[in-house]
Every structure is written in C-alpha cells, then in structure tokens.
Design a protein with these regions (language model features):
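Bacterial N-terminal signal peptides
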Residues: 4-14
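Surface-exposed, glycine-biased beta-strand/turn segments
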Residues: 18-119, 161, 198-342
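Residues that cap or initiate secondary-structure elements
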Residues: 86-88, 129, 140-143, 181
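Zn2+-dependent peptidoglycan hydrolase active-site motif and core
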Residues: 92-94, 98-141, 168-170, 174
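Surface-exposed strand-loop junctions at beta-sheet edges and helix termini
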Residues: 100, 144-145, 150
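Conserved, short, structured surface segments that act as functional micro-motifs
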Residues: 114-124, 148-223
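A short, hydrophobic/aromatic-rich structural module that often spans a beta strand
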Residues: 125-136, 152-155, 159, 226-237
Length: 343
C-alpha cells in the first residue's frame, strides 16, 4: 500500500530534472551532423552500393525491399550505433564508454561469442521512479563489474568491434535504452527459444528498446522530460487486448503506463504497442476476449508484417498476431509454462 502511495505521489509531484548524457565524446547528434554521429552500414540494393548513416540510427533502417513502387526498410535496429571520435594508428577506436546517467551495473558479459552484442554490459537507472536500463555493446574492454554504483559519465569500458556483423572499420558503440519485459525471462527462453541463456533477465530479447536518439534530443530541449512521458508519447501502431487474469507484473512495475485505475476490475487489458513492439500504453478494457487479440491497427496499404518486424500480419484496418507476436505477448504477460519458469 505504502509503495503504491509513494509511487502515486511521485507521479504527481513536479518533475525533477533528469540527468542524461551521451555515452561517448561524440556529440554530433546535437550539431545537426548525423553522418558524423551514426556509424554507417554497408548496403547493396538493386545493384547500388552505398554506406547510409541512417542504418546506424534507431528503428526500421535496414534491409530494404521493393514492394511495387515502394521501397520499405524492414529490419528493426533497436538502438543507435555511435561512431568513434578518435582512433589509434591501426584504426582501433580509443573512445571511453560512459554511463548515460546515475545507476547500478546489473550485468556484464565479457565473452564476445555469447551474444550478437559481443562484449556488453547493462546499467539499471532509477529515472522518474522506475527502472530504465541502458545497454552498451560491441565493447573491446569492460572495466565495470556487476554491482558497481556509477554516476553520469562514469567510465564503463572502451569502444570496440566485438560481436556479429562488425569489423574494425565499422567499430562503434551500440547503445540502447530499454524497459525490462519480464522478471522471469528464463522460463520464456526455455519455452520458446531453447539453447543456453547466458544473460539471465538481461538477454537482449527481454529488453524492449525505445528511440534513444529521440529521447536525447527531446531531453536536450526539455531537461525536465521524464523517460515515462517520452515512452507514452510514442505513437501506437497496433493494440492488443488480453484476458485479465490476476496481477500483471509488468503493469504493476510500470504503473505510469496504465491509463485508469490499475485496481479497478475489468475483464481484459488493452495494450498499445509502437510499430517496433515497445509497449506504450495499457488501459483496462470492458471487452471480453479468450486470447490475445489485435483490436486496433494503423491503416496501411503495405502489409503490416513489413512495418512491425513481423509481429502482426494483415492489411489495411485489420491484423492478427503472428507467432512472433504471440511470443511477445507471452513474454510481456509471463504467460509460459510454470515448470519452464522454475528451471
């Protein structure tokens, strides 16, 4: 009760300035020179070779396909790739990696081959009364350890090019700002993914990334901006209604996302998702559903699967959840076999 009261009061009080800073000395995001900030990708499309910097930004920025007269970028990039500001004579990046805000190191992966992230670490930040997680990937060296309390600008490691699909020429920092989907990820991984999960709850599949560059740009305009306000202002692409069955951990952890009374009875929840699959709103719903059901979607003449990383399918004003979409809902709602969750 007291925790709920404290959280409610914290949301009603005037917002305190949130301290955020970019994680390297490359600040060209703020200078209007994105080509000097983002690391480009190598692209060959319809016989044309290019190196677009846009491929290092957040969102659907990779893997173009032609659909009639349209060219659609179909691959989702969940963070941003930041160029090195300086290199040694051999071309190795020298940039130190800095914490974007005060927090605690909660995960370190020093074995590059255990993730597409290569060597990476995760920091938990208490921002606006809630846990927000930052991910720093492809590092050459990690100097922080789990449990370390860090300040804004604390050194976490050094930029590198470990992980999948990256070499020395394209060395960069991959940065994400995320919500934790489930506190029981091991159960979901056992039920739906298989293999070995080396990263506990801090596996990349359990971290839902927001538009991190957009967050930094908006925060620069308004230093009192809360991350929660930024997330809930993200446009919804589709909504899914799920049966309401007992207490929902994600909604309890992110009460700021709930519109209406979390404790008021209702037969279902309606969850708003961005096109990338980030939850951006939760509403108690009077609708009766037997299983997760798409109840709203942005009207598009392009098949929804191309615009939502395959989470939903269909055209125009109608859509259904794909297998990937159903697995996302299972992760978000802890809807997986209890025996798997126990392992």
């Amino acid at each position: 009760m007291f925790r709920h009261l404290a959280l409610t009061l914290s949301l009603l009080l005037p917002a305190a300035a949130v301290e955020l800073q970019l994680p390297t000395e490359n600040h060209h995001l703020f200078s209007g020179q994105p080509d000097k900030f983002y690391m480009y990708v190598d692209r060959i499309f319809e016989g044309e070779v290019s190196k677009p910097w846009e491929g290092g930004s957040f969102g659907f920025v990779r893997t173009p396909i032609r659909l009639g007269s349209d060219v659609v970028l179909t691959k989702f990039h969940e963070g941003i790739d930041i160029q090195p500001a300086k290199r040694d004579k051999a071309g190795n990046p020298l940039d130190l990696i800095l914490s974007v805000s005060d927090g605690t190191v909660v995960h370190v992966s020093n074995v590059a081959g255990r993730s597409n992230y290569g060597k990476y670490l995760v920091v938990e930040h208490q921002l606006g009364g809630d846990s927000i997680f930052s991910v720093y990937a492809h590092l050459a060296e990690i100097t922080a350890a789990p449990g370390d309390v860090v300040k804004t600008g604390s050194v976490l490691g050094r930029m590198g090019y470990t992980g999948a699909g990256i070499n020395r020429v394209r060395a960069h920092l991959h940065l994400e700002m995320c919500l934790l989907m489930s506190r029981h990820f091991g159960g979901w991984h056992s039920a739906f993914s298989g293999g070995t999960n080396f990263h506990g709850n801090f596996n990349g599949m359990n971290l839902a990334g927001m538009d991190v560059a957009g967050l930094f740009l908006e925060h620069r305009k308004n230093p009192e901006l809360r991350v929660q306000e930024f997330v809930t202002a993200t446009p919804a692409y589709f909504k899914v209604t799920i049966p309401r069955d007992g207490q929902w951990d994600f909604a309890s952890r992110h009460r700021w996302m709930v519109k209406g009374d979390l404790a008021a009875p209702s037969p279902s929840w309606e969850i708003s998702f961005s096109a990338t699959g980030l939850p951006v709103g939760i509403t108690p719903s009077p609708r009766e559903v037997a299983e997760p059901t798409v109840t709203a979607v942005r009207n598009s003449r392009i098949a929804h699967r191309h615009l939502t990383r395959g989470l939903i399918d269909g055209n125009g004003p109608s859509a259904t959840l794909t297998r990937s979409g159903k697995q996302l809902l299972a992760l978000l709602t802890d809807d997986f076999p209890k025996e798997a969750a126990a392992r």
